[in-house]
Design a protein with these regions (language model features):
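Conserved beta-strand-loop-alpha-helix junction that forms the acyl-donor binding cleft
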Residues: 128-137, 156-160
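Conserved active-site alpha-helix within GNAT-family acetyltransferase domains
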Residues: 108, 112, 120, 132-151, ...
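Glycine-rich acyl-CoA binding loop
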Residues: 61, 103-108
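Conserved GNAT-fold acetyl-CoA-binding loop/helix
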Residues: 22-48
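A short beta-loop-alpha structural element at the N-terminal edge
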Residues: 9-21
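Conserved GNAT acetyl-CoA-binding A-motif
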Residues: 119-129
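Conserved beta-strand in the GNAT
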Residues: 60, 69-78
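A short helix-loop-beta-strand connector motif used in the catalytic cores of GNAT acetyltransferases and
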Residues: 47-60, 91
């Protein structure tokens, strides 16, 4: 699916876009003051986004579509599930517009397309995160009618803490404390 006007094309990413996607991810990490945090590779993106069971979806915005297009931004998203609504949800992992294309409606067009996908897929909610200090983004999202869930805390577990908790599963299993069914991923 693509949506275009004379100045902008929004299209679904293709396998040949993994280098561009990774460039956008790295540029976003720099903007978010985490330039060394990206460990993803092109091979990771190719495997996880374009295989038989993709874990993510990605939209690419190209400016000056009539001229072959220049990469302007991207939206990177995946589906989750809300036990409270009993329906799928859409989670926007990344939204990024190159600095030279900001203020031209690229971000709004990408976010509108993601919202349209959520509605098409019968998702009652679209959710994402924004850094507190990113006031241009906070103001932008507020202007579109987004609500901010200040009472919720974002929780993450990585590295040694994740491995330690995973090891607890094996320890409980070997102790006979918990029986488990093998689940295919």
């Amino acid at each position: 699916m693509s949506k275009s006007s004379s100045a902008l094309l929004i299209r679904e990413a293709q396998p040949q876009d993994v280098s561009l996607i990774l460039d956008f991810i790295r540029a976003l990490a720099v903007y978010e003051r985490e330039p060394d945090a990206v460990t993803a590779t092109e091979a990771d993106l190719l495997r996880d986004g374009f295989g038989a069971q993709p874990y993510f979806h990605c939209l690419i915005a190209e400016h000056d579509a009539g001229d072959g297009g220049r990469p302007a931004g991207f939206a990177f998203y995946f589906f989750n599930y809300s036990t409270w609504t009993g329906r799928p949800g859409l989670y926007l992992e990344d939204l990024f517009v190159q600095p030279e294309f900001r203020g031209l409606g690229v971000g709004k067009a990408l976010l509108a397309r993601v919202a349209a996908i959520a509605v098409e897929k019968n998702c009652p909610r679209l959710q994402w995160e924004v850094l507190d200090w990113n006031t241009p983004a906070v103001d932008f999202y507020a202007s579109l009618g987004a609500s901010f869930l200040d009472e919720w805390r974002n929780v993450r577990m990585t590295g040694e803490a994740l491995r330690k908790l995973a090891a607890l599963d094996a320890a409980l299993d070997s102790a006979g404390a918990v029986a488990k069914n093998e689940v295919e991923a």
